[in-house]
Amino acid sequence: MSEIDILSFGETMAMFVAEQTGDLAEVSAFHRRIAGADSNVAIGLSRLGFNVAWLSRVGADSLGRFVVDTLEKEGLDCRHVDIDTAHPTGFQLKSRTDDGSDPVVEYFRRGSAASHLSPHSIVPELLKARHLHATGIPPALSESARQMSFELMTRMREAGRSVSFDPNLRPSLWANERQMITEINRLAALAHWVLPGLSEGRLLSGFEDPADIAAFYLDQGAEAVAIKLGPHGAYYRTHLDQGFVAGVPVATVVDTVGAGDGFAVGMISALLENHSFAEAVKRANWIGSRAVQSRGDMEGLPTRSEMSVEFEAAIAGKPAPTGFASVGAGLPRAAFRR
């Protein structure tokens, strides 16, 4: 195996996206894609030129073959995706919206192949990766997947590798809210970079203000925290620095799903390239804004060449081919209070 830049893990599902608006029960035609926050980030990083290994599990079925084929076409190393002959590949149905509102998503993943991930799925060779990206979704799938998440994050941190963590809360997958909060915060304590949304941070930390939420995670052991503030942008804090970075205005919001994954792609890629945290947030905001202008979870994630042209034009305040406005900073703290 060639040198691995980034290891990511989790569940990739087949996704059937409605081709017309309306209630899913009344939709007659769907377009097949793939979905999964963890693999969205992996794909985004692969498009930027990183060597990304994907650790997962799919069923021995047509949807599983479709998932693996799609990931491999995106450049992911899928040699450690296990084929499960006893459990199916999960899938989801996603509604279509034309007004920028959140789509309705129905999941069919209980008992899926990926829910049977376990510490036994970990291959020593994968632990040589420079960086591990984790989210709160795999630990919500099952006890064995939760054990794997803890072991991967612990071993990578102990080995001196950098670890990023996006809570990506999925309350419906947990037994109760208290368990979710406890386990997600335990995992966050194993990460160097923590990337919650504002509502997630409030629920998990018990604090309202972004600065206090960030301090909560810094006190637990994080080196840096970036809190997503939707269209407003993001607040970041390290042990030495803090600030707001304004969001990137977009003309039309097509699909909000995947914006947070795009943000993670920007943060991880920039930090692994030794950019400052403030510069990483600028890139993250830009990729997140690009994601919401595309129909689909990963379609808006840029290639390296696209980013070189569009992002550089955006931060320079010049008209970019996609029409993005420049990225600024200094939003008022009051804008992020309830």
Where do the protein language model's features map onto the residues?
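Short beta-strand scaffold segments in enzyme catalytic cores
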Residues: 43, 91-95, 233-236
